Amino acid sequence: MNRTRAQERTHERVRARPVLPGARVLVTRRCHDRRFFLSAFGDPRKGHTPEQTENFYGYTLARAVLKYGVELHAACQMGNHHHLSMTDVLGNRPNFKNSVHSNLARGLNARFGRFDSVWSGGGSCDTVAPSDHESLDDLAYADCNPVTSGLVKWAHLWPGFTTYGWRFGETRTFKRPDWYYDPDNPDNPEFITLTRVRPAIFLELSDDELFDKLMARCLEIQRAKQAEYKAENRRFMGLAKLARTKWWRRAKSWEDRFNEVPTVAASDRKKRAEQLERDRKWRAEYALERDNLKAGRPTTLPHGAYFLPRIYGVPVAKPP
């Protein structure tokens, strides 16, 4: 499929993707070699606890959210990957992700006494949700991931960081992990807060009604997984077995490889096709303006271009 699309292109490949202010995105990033660097239990031999891991993740996330003006809707720290459902209010998603992932990586390396890569080299998978229903499913997907992965029977049992059960507008406080963050740096306050923000979906519902709708969807997902395991005579891993998982080990479950990384999460094929077509047109326009830039001709990159305008001041078009 990728070869066919490459043959259909009339321009050189464009790796850039539009970074649009106000986009609702589900960000997923995996650890290197699928190893359990994000395990809530860390290394018990060094005195690590789930509470310490949750606090480090929460502080790091809250610090980036406040710095880059992101609205966080859901988050879940799994053992070897994590999920963030967010609205990129100001169009700062690349810098936001860099802050989260670089600080998590450095902190985890410091914690475990290692010096190699923490994240997989493929970068994060960022999918845009084009409808209210898809956005709600993103929240439920993140909140219920420990259950759908077969780790715990109920999402509230998960020992890592999770927004499951957080009401919209609820704020929680995290304390600076002084073993990583410099207390003399003014960017690292002793305490920092993180608020779960309601996404701009189902606007006819109040915050409480939308929360109830989300929790009903989460309950449906959890019961479906429990029924599936019961029918297959399988058990969830459980906390005791999770606590024995070594952080340096890798997941043994089956993993699809060499698949195209999705950019749109839509169950409606028409909406998905429309969004993908808009993305193709954007890349074609970007390629044309990139050629103009290389040739020294006047250049105006399409709205949503990020790197060249931010770093080199290349003009960018205004929002349509």
Predicted regions and their residues:
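Short catalytic/metal-binding and nucleic-acid-binding patches
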Residues: 1-320
